[in-house]
């Protein structure tokens, strides 16, 4: 059965804080994430009366292998220390740290729950207040 046939469903799109604001030098990436958010909002309105919610999560920099590799690249190419390179990724988070993958997963889990039945068409920033 489809979500519409079941009159229940949860669609959670993975966007980024780049869907909420612009960033220099990554205009293509920002444009694609803005598109995800536009699709999320439009689809949420299309299925709002059919028991389906549609939301987007918008994480900031998450502590993943990709970020750790980027830190290593910054160190090797610039001579910065690891802490200096990491600061590039943590300075946009008022909490001064990377977002944990478990925090993103917990947000997705909540959006899938009955407790989030009235949450639809939203962009949920998971960035330690960086977009506040």
Q: Would you name each region that the model predicts?
A:
Residues 1, 45-46, 117:
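Alpha-helical segment proximal to the catalytic Tyr-Lys
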Residues 8, 95-126, 131:
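C-terminal substrate-recognition "lid" of short-chain dehydrogenase/reductases
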Residues 16:
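Residue(s) in the substrate-gating loop at a strand-loop-helix junction
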Residues 21-27, 49-50, 96, 114:
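Active-site loop immediately N-terminal to the catalytic Tyr-X3-Lys motif
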Residues 32, 40:
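Active-site helix of classical SDR
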Residues 48, 53, 119-121:
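Short, small/polar-rich loop/turn modules that mediate ligand/substrate recognition or access, typified
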Residues 53-63, 112, 125-127:
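Conserved SDR Rossmann-fold cofactor-binding beta-strand/turn motif
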Residues 59-69, 73:
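Short, flexible catalytic-loop segment of classical short-chain dehydrogenase/reductase
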């Amino acid at each position: 059965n489809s979500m519409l046939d079941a009159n229940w469903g949860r669609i959670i799109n993975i966007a980024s804080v780049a869907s909420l604001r612009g960033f220099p030098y990554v205009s293509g990436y920002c444009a694609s994430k803005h598109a995800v958010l536009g699709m999320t909002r439009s689809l949420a309105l299309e299925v709002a009366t059919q028991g389906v919610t549609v939301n987007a999560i918008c994480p900031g920099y998450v502590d993943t292998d990709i970020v750790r590799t980027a830190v290593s690249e910054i160190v090797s190419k610039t001579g910065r220390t690891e802490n200096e390179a990491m600061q590039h990724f943590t300075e946009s988070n008022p909490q001064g740290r990377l977002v944990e993958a478990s925090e993103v997963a917990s947000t997705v889990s909540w959006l899938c729950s009955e407790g989030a039945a009235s949450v639809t068409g939203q962009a949920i920033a998971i960035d330690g207040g960086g977009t506040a």
